[in-house]
Amino acid sequence: MDIVHSHAVKNEQEGLGNLAGDPNQYFYPGDRHEHPAWDSLCFDYGKDEVMHFLLSNCKYWLSEYHFDGFRFDGVTSMLYYSHGLGEAFCNYGDYFNGHEDDNAICYLTLANCLIHEVNKHAITIAEEVSGMPGLAAKFADGGYGFDYRMAM
């Protein structure tokens, strides 16, 4: 299943854009609130309620509908504060320069651990353009836990 945890619709009527009257309840405030290329909102993975919401979403699809895996959409956008826009990614310094979103990396790692705990045969695929080292390495080996990386 294609799962989109990289961003959310800005709509306030049928989306999370202004849930309970707070436009930042699930999303980053300020300059990081909106994705500059997608006209959508960016989840704040450092908030407990966001982490619980997204992780429970993964578990729901696995438990209730018996999906056997996920292709995570827009992973590059999650990994970097710049969303990977305009970045070259030619050497390790481009990946690990303090511009990576540690909260998003934590979420992706926890999501992979959860998915593989609920269904040890589940497959996770990261749609990702930067080639982030360790993305498709097992958590036990120091990676983020994805089974595959889909280069775009």
Segments and roles (model prediction):
Residues 1-100:
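Substrate-binding/active-site clefts of carbohydrate-active enzymes
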Residues 26-29, 34-42, 75-152:
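Active-site-proximal helices and loops of the catalytic beta/alpha 8
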